[in-house]
Amino acid sequence: MTTGSALYIPPYKADDQDVVVELNNRFGAEAFTAQPTRTGMPVLWVARAKLVEVLTFLRNLPKPYVMLYDLHGVDERLRTKRQGLPSGADFTVFYHLMSLERNSDVMIKVALSESDLSLPTVTSIWPNANWYEREVWDMYGIDFKGHPHLSRIMMPPTWEGHPLRKDFPARATEFDPFSLNLAKQQLEEEAARFRPEDWGMKRSGANEDYMFLNLGPNHPSAHGAFRIILQLDGEEIVDCVPDIGYHHRGAEKMAERQSWHSFIPYTDRIDYLGGVMNNLPYVLSVEKLAGIKVPEKVDVIRIMMAEFFRITSHLLFLGTYIQDVGAMTPVFFTFTDRQKAYTVIEAITGFRLHPAWYRIGGVAHDLPRGWEKLVKDFVEWLPKRLDEYTKAALQNSILKGRTIGVAQYNTKEALEWGVTGAGLRSTGCDFDLRKARPYSGYENFEFEVPLAANGDAYDRCMVRVEEMRQSVKIIDQCLRNMPEGPYKADHPLTTPPPKERTLQHIETLITHFLQVSWGPVMPANESFQMIEATKGINSYYLTSDGGTMSYRTRIRTPSFAHLQQIPSVIKGSMVADLIAYLGSIDFVMADVDR
């Protein structure tokens, strides 16, 4: 199920300076200040007055930066290691742009004074800037002039303050005890009421009144605590407003009070179906800060376990997706089949859903005795099982009728909205980070990138089914070619250090005690790592101030971008089509809300 892509993806160019030359030629070198980082891309500071002009230039280049991959902020006021920061930078807003035709990224930063926290919106350049700008305002109080609807997105409408500011409390014990009297309850209920006029919607058309329907936040087809308000003309969706934030737990704030080591279990709970796949971009980014090169065996173990979790996540997607369009039986089979994968995962890591098993510099422990047979049995069994699903369910005429041609979009639209993963590849765009920008040794494995052509709900499902087959191929190669060697790097910042040395050397024992109890001290710098996760591209952008905890942890998840795209895709469709579309996205709200 592979097809040719009209878009050629060249070899990855880390820290590509070509765009810097183009920017200097157009605006002059004095317009930019380069910041050296370990992010693997050019990082350029620009004045606020030039921001929109620079971003428009990058969007319209012959090989354009078509995707606004990420947009967020940093409160710089308590940062002590300020090399590379402009003077007076109390707050930073960064724009991470991606070009597929160049296969390279660039980051544009703007420094803001605490007394003047405003920027022009860039929603006219990239439509997906809408939610990102809302979140920056919600978390930092930075105003975006000209934004179509600048309002809370993660926090409740009645919330006071901006949680990611450094002067905002980080623990519940720093707040007054929670209480809910009748007056406050009524206030919260009224604040949650949807008012069409606030969103530029009419209550009636030329010949009829519209109905406004709350789908969620606890509807089974919403796949979590997610509300989407539908403006309906009969069964037809005239417009809709997704409402997120019900599952927000402040993961990025938590990272500021956990050590580099102790934050690993928190990553498991971002995409809570992704298991160790969540650990991978985080530990890779920390290892960039630390300058750690892990042994080959660590890379292969990490890849093998990440692909196991890709399979378990996709199996759950498959069962619930088929259930969403009306077939009840397959979900029971997919859950039973996931158990076979979890038997292997539990034998290797000791846990099932949330192993928190990767470590800075390696993995928690070596592979156990007998792991080979468990893995071998699984890779021999699953492909035949996928054949059964394809015959029994995916070729079913009812499922095809509910999903083929439904919620369809093309590559251009996908890139404009920041869509990645199977949602992008279902449009025919051959962009998979494991091939396009290999990490952890993926370049040493033979596998294909499943593609489709129509970009509809059916194709998104079929791409994921084929991805499971490719994951089995990768796991099989790990089984056959597992290297010998240590499961941790020999590096001072490997956390915890190799256990056997702590029993022989007092210095290593002291290091073990300090790194586990206090935390390893990472060099002051910024690092970044993206991976091809279960639901699309997931990344961690880390800022170290030379301490035992992260100064700023930015977690970019694929599902946030995917839900923002919903209104542009589903207008004019039926409510039943929306249910099929939501299922085909494959999201969990923890991945959206963090």
Swiss-Prot record:
Q: Which SUPFAM superfamilies match?
A: HydB/Nqo4-like, Nqo5-like
Single GO cellular component term: NADH dehydrogenase complex
Q: What class of enzyme is it?
A: translocase
Translocase recorded as keyword: yes
Pfam families per UniProt: Complex1_30kDa, Complex1_49kDa
Q: Tell me a Gene Ontology molecular-function term this record carries.
A: NAD binding
Q: Where is this region: NADH dehydrogenase I subunit C?
A: 1-185
Where in the cell does this protein reside?
Cell inner membrane
Record-listed E.C. numbers: 7.1.1.-
Q: Which residues form a coiled coil?
A: none
Q: What are the UniProt keywords, alphabetically?
A: Cell inner membrane, Cell membrane, Membrane, Multifunctional enzyme, NAD, Quinone, Translocase, Transport, Ubiquinone
Q: Which PROSITE patterns match?
A: COMPLEX1_49K
The entry sums up its family as follows: In the N-terminal section; belongs to the complex I 30 kDa subunit family.
Instruction: Report what the protein is called.
Output: NADH-quinone oxidoreductase subunit C/D
Originating species: Pseudomonas fluorescens (strain Pf0-1)
What gene name is given for the protein in this entry? nuoC
